[in-house]
Structures are given as C-alpha cells and as structure tokens.
Design a protein with these regions (language model features):
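Short active-site neighborhood of thiol/selenol oxidoreductases, capturing the structured segment around
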Residues: 102-126
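Extended ligand-binding clefts on enzyme/binding-domain cores
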Residues: 229-238, 258-266, 312-317, 335-491, ...
Length: 561
C-alpha cells in the first residue's frame, strides 16, 4: 500500500515537473515572439520618414502625433500645400492672444518667411532646437525670417510652456501661436517639427517634415529661394559633367560601354531642353558645342561617345529631341547656326532613318547604310514630326506612319498603355515587358501632342494618387516581380505628364514621390542629386527631375516644336 502511494506520489511529481518544463518552453517561445515583434517594429520604423537621408528626415516619435495609418514618406508632408501656390489663409496669435494674419506679417517684414511648426512637449522639436543658431543664421543669409509657430493644443501645450522652452534654448526668432491647431489642420500638417518656406509674396516655395540637420535646413532654403532645380543643376555640372559640355551617364565609372564617363545623346538632348526652359543660352551653347564637335557625324548624333569607344549608330528619338531644341533656340535667340544645324540633321534623319515603308526606325549606322527594322514607340514624337511635316512634304508619310503605329500600339482597354516596339518586317508589336520609363515617355510624347487618350491618363493618375508605379510591367498589366521599386525618373515623367494634362494636384503629388530620393543635405557631396546612399547617380534620373523642377519653379514652358 505504502509502495503504491509512493509510486503515485513519484508519478505526480514527475507529471508536475513535466508541466513545468512545458510551461517554461511556452514562456521562452512567447518571449522570443515578443522580441521578434519588437525587432520588426524597429525595422519598420527605419522605413518611415527619417530612415533615409534622401528625404527630409525625422526620427519617428509617437510624441509627434503621427497617424500610423499613413504609409509612405510623402504622407508625412503637408497635404494641403502646393509649390508655387498660396497656402490656406493663416491667422495666428501672439502671447497676448492678439490675432495676426500671416500674410500681413510677411508683407510687413518684406521678406520670405521660414515657418517651423513645433511644440514644447515634442522631443523631435527639442532636437531641432539644437541647431537653432544655425537656423537663424541661414535665414538671414537667404534674406528670410525664421518664424516659430507653436502648435497650441490646449490639452498638451500652453503659452507658458512654450515660453520656457524658448528661453531654455535662447531662441531669438519670433514666435506666434496656433490656438487649437487651426492653421496646422488647414495646411494639412502631419507632424512636428515641420517646415514651410514662403516667399515675400506669401507663396509656398518649399516644405519638409521632421527634424532637419543644419545641412538639410540649408538645402531647404536653397530650394525655396534659388529654385527647386538649382542644386540639381549644380550637382550635374559638378559631378556628371566632363568639363566640356558633355553630361556623363553616371557617377560610376566602371562597366561595359557606355560606362559612367561616357556621354549619351539622350542626356545632351535633355540638357538642351532644360537650357531652353531656363532661357540659359550659355548653358545651351556649351552643351551644343560638345554635341556638335564630339558626337555629330554625317548629320546624325552618335548615341554615345567615350574616351575609348563611341556608338556606331544614332538613336532617332535623341536626334528628334535635339532638332526640336535647335529649332526652339533659333526662335528664342534668333541665331542662324541653330537653324542651320537643325536643317542638316533633319535632312540626314529623313535620308537614313526612314525605311522604304515611310516609317521612322530606331537607328541608322553613322558610317554605313544599315538601319533598324524596328521602332520603339517612345521614339515617335508627334510634336516634332508634325512641325517637320508642315515645312517639308517629304516628311508627311513619316508622320502618317507614326500615327498609325501609335494607334495600333495601344495594348488593351484594361491596360491602356502602349507596346514597347513595332517590327516593320513582321508587322507585329513587341510582346516584351514594358520598361515603365519608356512607357511613360510614350505617354509624355502623346500628351505634348494633345493626343493622350483619356483612359491612359486616368490609369496613370490613379497610380499617382496611390503612390505606386512599378518599374516594369507585363503586357497583361501586371507588375513584373522584383520591379516594384521606386524609380525617380518614372515619377519625374509622371509629373511632366500631369503638367501637360493641366492637373495641378497630380503634378504636386508626382513631384513629392519623385523627391523621395532627393539629397537635401547641403553638406553632402551628393546635394541636389537623386540617389540612394552608396549608390551611383545616373544622368537620366537627374535630368528628368531637372525638367520637372524647373517647370515647378516657374521655368518657361517648352513642349518641343
């Protein structure tokens, strides 16, 4: 009996020990799961604004009152502001609760104003105040006034608390208050600190979210008062130029030709267009000099040239772009050499880049008789072809052929983009995946010619609104796996198309998406570039945004001719 009891007792104890071991294992598993969850949260935080150096960055802080439903860096920017537009009316108060119109305040100051929204309880705002001396000095350098606007949420903030914080940091800049966050809400602010720069007329010129370094503060003011394209042009001329008017293809010098130090005809044409938008004849002439001296052969432009090797063919799209630039320069500055070179190139293009069917082809040999039997649809620039056909009847069949190829090149109602290319020999359109930059270039050409179908524009506008455009698509409209990444050039082209379509809201949103990889820090050697940290900067990713930014900053419209 005693032995039976001992057996049962030992069995019970063993069972209890087993349960203890199970409980221990469960506790360890739960702890590991919690650690993994924390790790994922911290990793996700790096993807929020502040996790990259290419956009104005703030360390994510729950005290900043962010809406966690927002998903992309652009969603933290002011939602109701637009570059080159007036902000919603803003009435603030001083310490004595006297109402002050911001527009009247700016008029009285007779200068631009750098508005920084903040609050005394915000840790990120405290970090911003650590560079307050630099901020005040930069504002003076750019001829602006720094204005601190306290986010006066009655539940969390008070005038007294704000005054103490200002005294603590020895701030000398003026401070106004936003009772009940009326202006904060009207402007669509998403977090503090956030900066908005207005010119002396009260027009929005730049904005940024989060805690900015001194270098980013300088970059913000540079954008506001020197133009959105100023730093980008400086980066191109300083880091991508060969010193003789050629724009190198990349900051990476290695690889098969064309390498980073080689110059593409694509880049030269885009730089000529930019010079026309900015009415900069000196830049135009410098760019043209290299193009003419080093790239022109038998009336056509080599698609690339380098120190060791040059392309043996042209790229018809680039020749058309350069012809348009030359015609635009002749009209703007009235100098005969521009028109003379344009005529020479037009003659060569007609003689060597048009097939027996009257169709424009992708390329022709510079020294031989060979030519392509295909045409990329993004090469069919109707604006240029129409202008040339009006002056030379021999080009009328080329225009008609281009219109027919484009008309037949639409993929489907459900996916209203255009096939990548057309083969004249097989009379068939390419079924290869679409490079989205090329696909949008086709849409840009059509929009400039007032020929973009409404459903194609709606397709693009929906994606601008959603903030997602893949870098490559199958012809069935699905995104190619592995190409769902952010492309600066794609967003720049989306902005240019929105501009042509007269959709200011879509233009602003596309600019914001485009700016995701913009290097704002004026103390960074890549300042003004669109590039990820540690990655090369490519010319196309700089030049397309350069055009969009120039237009956003008031540049002269140039649609080609």
């Amino acid at each position: 009996m005693a032995a039976g009891k001992n057996f049962l007792k030992n069995k019970a104890e063993a069972s209890e020990k087993k349960r203890d071991r199970v409980r221990y294992i469960l506790y360890v598993c739960i702890a590991l799961l919690l650690l993994a969850a924390v790790g994922l949260i911290l990793y996700a935080a790096r993807l929020l604004p502040g996790g990259t150096d290419a956009v104005p960055a703030a360390t994510p802080s729950p005290t900043a009152g962010r809406n966690q439903a927002l998903a992309t860096p652009e969603d933290w920017l002011p939602q109701n502001l637009a570059i080159a537009k007036f902000p919603p009316e803003a009435v603030l108060t001083d310490e004595r609760e006297n109402r002050i119109s911001l527009r009247d305040w700016i008029a009285q100051e007779e200068s631009g104003v750098w508005v920084v929204f903040w609050a005394s309880w915000c840790p990120d705002c405290n970090r911003q105040f650590e560079v307050i001396r630099e901020m005040e000095a930069l504002a003076e350098t750019y001829g602006a006034r720094l204005l601190l606007v306290d986010r006066l949420n009655r539940e969390k903030e008070s005038v007294e608390a704000a005054r103490k914080k200002i005294a603590e940091y020895g701030v000398t800049a003026p401070v106004l208050y936003d009772p009940d966050e009326v202006v904060y809400s009207a402007w669509g602010m998403r977090e503090i600190p956030s900066s908005v720069v207005l010119d002396k007329d009260g027009v929005v010129r730049a904005y940024a979210n989060g805690t900015l370094t001194a270098g980013q503060c300088e970059g913000l003011l540079d954008r506001a008062f020197r133009g959105r394209d100023s730093a980008g042009l400086a980066f191109i001329l300083g880091s991508l130029s060969n010193g003789r008017g050629g724009v190198c293809s990349s900051t990476a010098a290695e690889g098969d030709p064309p390498t980073g130090t080689d110059v593409l005809s694509e880049s030269q044409g885009l730089m000529l267009w930019y010079a026309l938008i900015r009415e900069d004849q000196a830049l135009f002439d410098q760019t043209l000099a290299f193009t003419r001296t080093d790239m022109l052969k038998n009336g056509l432009i080599a698609w690339y040239v380098g120190e060791q090797k040059a392309g043996a063919v042209n790229a018809s799209l680039d020749d058309l772009r350069i012809i348009q630039a030359l015609r635009g320069a002749a009209e703007k500055w009235g100098e005969a050499p521009y028109a003379s070179l344009a005529a020479e190139m037009e003659k060569a293009l007609l003689a060597r880049c048009v097939n027996t069917q009257g169709g424009l082809v992708d390329w022709a040999e510079l020294d031989g008789e060979g030519q392509a039997h295909t045409i990329s649809l993004c090469y069919l620039d109707l604006v240029c072809l129409r202008a040339l056909a009006q002056e030379d009847a021999a080009l009328a069949p080329v225009l008609e052929n281009a219109e027919q190829v484009l008309q037949g090149g639409r993929i489907a109602d459900a996916f209203p983009l255009y096939y990548a290319g057309y083969d004249y020999e097989t009379a068939a359109y390419s079924q290869t995946d679409l490079n989205t930059a090329e696909a949008l270039y086709t849409l840009w050409n059509l929009s400039r010619a007032d020929a973009l179908p409404e459903d194609a524009w709606l397709w693009l506008r929906e994606r601008i609104e959603a903030g997602t455009i893949s870098a490559r698509y199958h012809v069935d409209g699905t995104a190619v796996k592995g190409f769902e990444y952010h492309s600066t050039a794609v967003w720049g082209l989306a902005a240019l198309i929105a501009r042509e379509m007269g959709d200011e809201a879509a233009f602003e949103k596309a600019l914001r998406r485009m700016d995701r990889m913009y290097v704002l820090d004026a103390q960074d050697v890549r300042f003004g570039a669109y590039a990820q940290k540690g990655a090369a900067a490519h010319a196309f990713d700089q030049l397309i945004p350069l055009l969009a930014n120039a237009l956003a900053s008031g540049g002269n419209e140039f649609r080609g001719m």
